[in-house]
Swiss-Prot record:
Substrates-to-products reaction catalysed: 5,6,7,8-tetrahydromethanopterin + formaldehyde = 5,10-methylenetetrahydromethanopterin + H2O; D-ribulose 5-phosphate + formaldehyde = D-arabino-hex-3-ulose 6-phosphate
Region (Formaldehyde-activating enzyme): 1-162
Domain of life: Archaea
Catalytic site positions: 18
Keyword Protein biosynthesis: no
Record-linked SMART domains: OMPdecase
Family, similarity comment: In the N-terminal section; belongs to the formaldehyde-activating enzyme family.
Keywords on record: Carbohydrate metabolism, Lyase, Multifunctional enzyme
Enzyme Commission code: 4.2.1.147, 4.1.2.43
InterPro entries in alphabetical order: Aldolase_TIM (IPR013785), Fae/Hps (IPR020868), HCHO-activating_enzyme (IPR014826), HCHO-activating_enzyme_sf (IPR037075), HPS/KGPDC (IPR041710), OMPdeCOase_dom (IPR001754), Ribosomal_Su5_D2-typ_SF (IPR020568), RibuloseP-bd_barrel (IPR011060)
Presence of keyword NADP: no
UniProt binding sites for substrate: 20, 49, 67, 69, 84
Name of this protein: Bifunctional enzyme Fae/Hps
Amino acid sequence: MEFRIGEALIGEGFEVAHVDLIIGTKDSPAGIAFANALANLSAGHTPLLAVLRPNLITKPPAVIVPKVTVKDMHQAELIFGPAQAAVAKAVADAVEEGIIPRERADEYVVVASVFIHPNAKNKHKIYYYNYGATKLAIKRAMQNFPDVDTVLYEKDRSFHPFVGRKLTKLWDPPYLQIAIDIPDLGEVLKVLEQIPDSDHIVFEVGTPLAKRYGCEVILKLREVKPDAFYILDLKTLDVGNLEARMAADATANAVVISGLAPTSTIVKGIREAEKTGILSYVDMMNVDDPIKRLEEIQKAGVLPNVVELHRAIDSEDKEPPWMLAGKIKEKFSVLVAVAGGIRPENVEEVIAAGADIIVVGRAVTKARDVEGAVRKFMSHMKPDTDQFRIMTDF
């Protein structure tokens, strides 16, 4: 028994071809799906056999299932015409080229789910796009593409055409974290508009802003920066699970818990963050011994994703916070964010000390040239992910 899955997208415009494909032996789930497709017809999604010409099906047999509801004869003509012929030719050529073993052609069946946009018109594009997509989907299925290593490499680099690139993890440090402590939403939005897009810039929704407008202020910020990574700085001291859930419900990507909170509160907050798919920060501002505090949290069975060594605005005459970053990373599997006293001229020193996340606030948000200030910091950091990679389908 053999069961394989493949997928491919080729082309552009309304004629773009997107093929989801199952190929397998007749005694596998592929065989059951093939039989069900032909036996259980659905209005607007009637499956049809792929034929090279009338009265000549392919080997292996292939059934085509329209993804988009067929509502008129124009759409039906495109499915029963160029799409059907393209899938059939792709299957036959896959056998001829050895993608599907010739000696096993009678053992396999193919189920191809085909997308034809209601506004598609150019039959030549429909044919060639669907031919290429079907053959590529078969090849990927037979090669078990992608392997797990490819998926893990690509998952944070991928740009989805309808969604964009959504950061859910801080996987490629260092990052510039811009702390937005301005308690005026109008001014905040003006600042955001001036900050260049980069997947190495993340935004901290500061406590004053969150207190004034509530957690869901993030939704307002997403109107300007929809794909950005937002850290909601609640400085949680109690009900850690509740506040972490509130952050997640507001589409925050991370929540900040105070290191001064009871250990039980921190643990509940971290676990709720894990449950809801967001990251957890523990802010060590005013914590006398951050390493000891982390040991206590670890002993309780958890660790945050990020530890923030935070020198408060009112304490900027104290020792730079990044001096402790290396020691923390030696003992704990966490990212370290540092805040306070960071300027473009000392960014490289801070990173060399072990910081993964550089937190700046007024140096950007109060700058006369916001974009210029950001670029000064970013000049000491990495370029965007795959900025110099030539992308085709992959």
